[in-house]
Every structure is written in C-alpha cells, then in structure tokens.
Amino acid sequence: MEERERGARSAGAGSPARPPSPRLDVSSDSFDPLLALYAPRLPPIPYPNAPCFNNVAEYESFLRTGVRGGGRGRGRARGAAAGSGVPAAPGPSGRTRRRPDAPAPDPERIQRLRRLMVAKEEGDGAAGAGRRGPGRSRKAPRNVLTRMPLHEGSPLGELHRCIREGVKVNVHIRTFKGLRGVCTGFLVAFDKFWNMALTDVDETYRKPVLGKAYERDSSLTLTRLFDRLKLQDSSKKEADSKSAVEDSTLSRYSQTSTWKLASVWGRADTGRGSHKRSRSVPSSLQASAREESRSELSGRTTRTDGSSVGGTFSRATTLSRGQSRKKKRKPKVDYQQVFTRHINQIFIRGENVLLVHLAQ
C-alpha cells in the first residue's frame, strides 16, 4: 500500500496539474466527503484563509454569533476585526461588542440611564428597609421568655397567666409505668413542648417499683398516693407518741433508782453509827456476829453468781441465734412507701408531664 501511494505521489508530481474531479471539488454539488477523506491528496480549497472548526456545533454557534468558541478562532476574529477596522459582535462572555450595523453610542443617553439605575437602586433599598424594619443588629431577641406571651388563647396561655399572677400549679409526673408523684410550686418558664421550670416546689412521690414486684404491683393513682401518705403520717405520729411514753417511763425509772441508791447510802451510814456504838459489846458476841454475816454473804454471792452465769449464757445463746437469723433474712423493702421533699428549683421535661392544674 505504501509503495502504491508513493508511486501515485511521484506520478502526480511528474505529471502536469489536472483539474480536480467534481466529486473532490468542495464547491460542486456532487462533492463526496468520504472520497475526499480517503484521497491521497487533500482537495484544493478555493478560500485559503477560511477558518477551521472542530465540529458542526462550533460552526453553528459561529453562524449565530459571528464569533468562534475556540481560542484560536477568537484570536483570529479579534485580529481580523482589528485589521479591518469593523467592530465585532458581542460574544457569549458578555463583553459589549458592537455589530457593524449598530449606530454610534450616545453619551447623554448613557448618562440618563445610569442616573435612573442609581435612583431605582436607592428606592428599592429604602422599600426593603421599611419592610424589614430594624437591621439585624437591632433585631429583637427570640427566646423562651419572648415566645411565652404569644400563646394567649390556648392552654399554654393559661400557664403564662399563672406566671403573671403568681398562681401555684400542680404538675403530675409519670414514670415508665404510670404516675410517679405531684410537684406543687410556682411556674417560671415553659415552652411549646411543655418543658417547665418551677421554683419553691413541694414534691410528693413514690419510687418506681423494679424487679418481680413490678409485675405484681398495681398502678398508682392520686387517691392511693395521698392515702398512703396519710397512713404514713398517722403511723409516724403513733411512733412518736410511743417514744415519748417510753422516755417518760425511763425518766421515772431513773428517778426511782436514784431514790433507792440514796436509801442504801443512808442505811450504810446508820450501820456505821451502830458499829461505833457496839464497841462496848463483848468480843465473843462480836466474833459470832461476824461469822454469821460472812456465811450469809457467801451464800448470797454463790446464788447470785450461779444465776448470773446461767443468765449470761442463756442470753449469749439467744443473741447468737438471733444474729444468725437476722443475717439469713433479707431486709424487707416497702415499695409502697411515699416520700416528700422540698426543692428550690426544678426542671420538668414535657414528656414526663401528665396533667397540670391550678393548686387550690
């Protein structure tokens, strides 16, 4: 193939120039582009300075705008426009280029248009400022305290009334199972999610039941809660009265014991006086009296020692048994116990709020 092409080229170079066939003539109607592509020599172009385009789309854009999209064509177009002295058409980049048939610009008209544009921009700025009100720096803050008055005419509006008038509210709180307790205090702030902040709060609550007692325990209600609280208060009063009675009995017993000790000391003093008086008694009688008193004291001490030893042994055994039993037994937990406490301030989440009503 290469040899044939070389031979054709050498033959063409040696032979005189022939007129191109109509199939290879670009200006003829019978032009065959496929044959021109595979021809050994490029067909002659009647316009040597014609621009070259990469594709058909670039050629179509050149026909619409008169400016080539590529850098080479753009530079060539600029150079051609500068050389010919004809102003170029406006390009796609937005640069102002006058067409050949466009009239000369009027400077007075341009000045009038600029003045109108400036006045319009100033008017639009004033209107926007009037609509927006104060600027961003002067914008009123938006927070929970500013949003609370906007809930007038709704249940949240009643909460805002309680804040203004200082009315106490009762907030019923729940756990994962049911009612937990009641918080009574003064409302300070709230939001649309029923999150609340209270001060000077008195809470009555019961700890949640866990473990196996959770399955057996019945649901807590307000009546059960406050009935249990009353029962605890009454039992506490009874325990206090019993402790007062025991304290009074102990004080009486201590008084009687002091009286007995005083009487014993008095008897001892009288015995000493009689002993002094009995010095005049004969020595034989004194010796017999001493022996009798010693025998009586020894008998009493043996009895008391035996009884004390037996008593201490029996008490020790009972105490050891009681301690072992206490160790085996688990401490009993009262799940129904109700607690009360006072809190200076508290935050309650809205998901834990069951009911809110005014305190009587």
Curated annotation (Swiss-Prot):
Modification Phosphoserine, positions: S15, S21, S154, S280
Biased composition (Polar residues): 299-322
Subcellular location: Nucleus
Chain positions found as Omega-N-methylarginine: R41
Alphabetical UniProt keywords: Aicardi-Goutieres syndrome, Disease variant, Isopeptide bond, Methylation, mRNA processing, Nucleus, Phosphoprotein, Repeat, Ribonucleoprotein, RNA-binding, Ubl conjugation
Origin: domain of life: Eukaryota
Cross-link Glycyl lysine isopeptide (Lys-Gly) (interchain with G-Cter in SUMO2) mapped to chain: K120
Disulphide bridges, residue numbers: none
SMART domains according to UniProt: Sm (SM00651)
Spans annotated as Disordered: 1-29, 68-143, 268-333
GO molecular function: U7 snRNA binding
One of the GO biological process terms: regulation of chromatin organization
SM 2: region residues: 343-356
SUPFAM superfamilies noted in UniProt: Sm-like ribonucleoproteins (SSF50182)
PANTHER family named among the record's database cross-references: U7 SNRNA-ASSOCIATED SM-LIKE PROTEIN LSM11
Domain comment, as recorded: The C-terminal SM 1 domain is both necessary for the binding to the Sm-binding site of U7 snRNA and U7 snRNP assembly. The N-terminal domain is essential for histone pre-mRNA cleavage. Amino acids 63-82 are sufficient to interact with ZNF473.
The protein, known as: U7 snRNA-associated Sm-like protein LSm11
Organism encoding this protein: Homo sapiens
